[in-house]
Structure formats: structure tokens, C-alpha cells
């Protein structure tokens, strides 16, 4: 008779323990239910990028002195700088400047080391195309400023993301 009573007691203890574990899991689920969603609906919602975001490079043709520092500091020798030496004034004249964003790793060395600050990083990160040759930007394409995300009325911008607890 005693073995049967102890089995019922063990069964009762196991049932209470299982209910407690299920309750703990349910409480964790409920605590996550009132948090803001982490996922954004990308084409319709966009995050505001930080000031230090390394997006597409903006180039100012008038400021460039064709010193080629950007080419020397680039880990993959990417910027193509074509210049002509003006013998009468003994200065280089910039003819063409281009960057292939299909190869660029967006390290920002060219922007950091440019002595005249003619290069800057923008907040533009949507560079996808169907043809990789369209990613080769010349000085005209590099000179265009991107449309600001805040000014685009077709999308909802998300300013504050919920902070993750670690």
C-alpha cells in the first residue's frame, strides 16, 4: 500500500513542477509581449542612419587637387584619378575621377585622409542594380547628393529603436 501512495505523491510533485515550469515560460513570453517590435518593414520603413554611417561616397570636383592620396590609402587601390600636368602653372588638373562601388569595401580611408575634404560619406546605402557596370560612378554621379531619408514622404522613418538589454 505504501508504494502506491508514494507513487501518487511523486506524480503530484512532478505535476506541480511541470506546471511551475510552464508558468515560468509563460511569464517570460508575457514579459516580451509588451516590447516594441525589432523588425522594420524595409521598403516602407527606414532607420535613420548615424552620423558615422559609411554609405556612398560624395565627391566635390572643385576641391580635388589630384594628389592621389585616396588611391594610396585605399586597401584595394580603387579610386581612378586621371589628371594632366599643367606646365605653365605647375599644377595637376583633374580630368576624371571614378569609384566602382561594386568593388569598394566602404572602409572610409579615402575620406579620412583626403587633405582637401573633397570626399565625404553619405547616408545612401541603396546601391543595388541589375547590372554591375552601373555601380561604376564617375565624378558627375559622385557629385550628386542623395535624397535625405527624412525628406522622403513615401516612407516612414524610425528615429528611436528600442534599446537591447544585454
Swiss-Prot record:
Enzyme Commission number, as recorded: 7.1.1.-
Residue ranges of domain 4Fe-4S ferredoxin-type in the record: 55-84, 95-124
Binding site for [4Fe-4S] cluster 1: 64, 67, 70, 114
GO MF annotations, alphabetized: 4 iron, 4 sulfur cluster binding; iron ion binding; NADH dehydrogenase (ubiquinone) activity; quinone binding
Subunit structure: NDH is composed of at least 16 different subunits, 5 of which are encoded in the nucleus.
Protein name: NAD(P)H-quinone oxidoreductase subunit I, chloroplastic
Keywords: 4Fe-4S, Chloroplast, Iron, Iron-sulfur, Membrane, Metal-binding, NAD, NADP, Plastid, Plastoquinone, Quinone, Repeat, Thylakoid, Translocase
Pfam families reported for this sequence: Fer4
Residues that bind [4Fe-4S] cluster 2: 74, 104, 107, 110
GO annotations of cellular component type: chloroplast thylakoid membrane
Note describing how the cofactor binds: Binds 2 [4Fe-4S] clusters per subunit.
SUPFAM superfamilies, per the entry: 4Fe-4S ferredoxins (SSF54862)
Cofactor: [4Fe-4S] cluster
Chief subcellular location: plastid
PANTHER family noted in UniProt: NAD(P)H-QUINONE OXIDOREDUCTASE SUBUNIT I, CHLOROPLASTIC
NCBIfam families (alphabetical): ndhI, NuoI, PRK05888.1-3
UniProt similarity note: Belongs to the complex I 23 kDa subunit family.
Job description of the protein: NDH shuttles electrons from NAD(P)H:plastoquinone, via FMN and iron-sulfur (Fe-S) centers, to quinones in the photosynthetic chain and possibly in a chloroplast respiratory chain. The immediate electron acceptor for the enzyme in this species is believed to be plastoquinone. Couples the redox reaction to proton translocation, and thus conserves the redox energy in a proton gradient.
Catalysed conversion reaction: a plastoquinone + NADH + (n+1) H(+)(in) = a plastoquinol + NAD(+) + n H(+)(out); a plastoquinone + NADPH + (n+1) H(+)(in) = a plastoquinol + NADP(+) + n H(+)(out)
Topology within the bilayer: Peripheral membrane protein
GO biological process, one term: photosynthesis, light reaction
Entry-linked InterPro entries: 4Fe4S_Fe-S-bd (IPR017896), 4Fe4S_Fe_S_CS (IPR017900), NADH_quinone_OxRdtase_chainI (IPR010226), NDHI (IPR004497)
Amino acid at each position: 500500500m505504501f508504494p502506491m501512495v508514494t507513487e501518487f505523491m511523486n506524480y503530484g510533485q512532478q505535476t506541480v513542477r511541470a506546471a511551475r515550469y510552464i508558468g515560468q515560460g509563460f511569464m517570460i513570453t508575457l514579459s516580451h509581449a509588451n516590447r516594441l517590435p525589432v523588425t522594420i518593414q524595409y521598403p516602407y520603413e527606414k532607420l535613420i542612419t548615424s552620423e558615422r554611417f559609411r554609405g556612398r561616397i560624395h565627391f566635390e570636383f572643385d576641391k580635388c587637387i589630384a594628389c592621389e592620396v585616396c588611391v594610396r590609402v585605399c586597401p584595394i587601390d580603387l579610386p581612378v584619378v586621371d589628371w594632366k600636368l599643367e606646365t605653365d602653372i605647375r599644377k595637376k588638373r583633374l580630368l576624371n575621377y571614378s569609384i566602382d562601388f561594386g568593388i569598394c569595401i566602404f572602409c572610409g580611408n579615402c575620406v579620412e585622409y583626403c587633405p582637401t575634404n573633397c570626399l565625404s560619406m553619405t547616408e545612401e546605402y541603396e546601391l543595388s542594380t541589375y547590372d554591375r557596370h552601373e555601380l561604376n560612378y564617375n565624378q558627375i554621379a559622385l557629385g550628386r547628393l542623395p535624397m535625405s531619408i527624412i525628406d522622403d514622404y513615401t516612407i516612414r522613418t524610425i528615429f528611436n529603436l528600442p534599446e537591447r538589454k544585454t
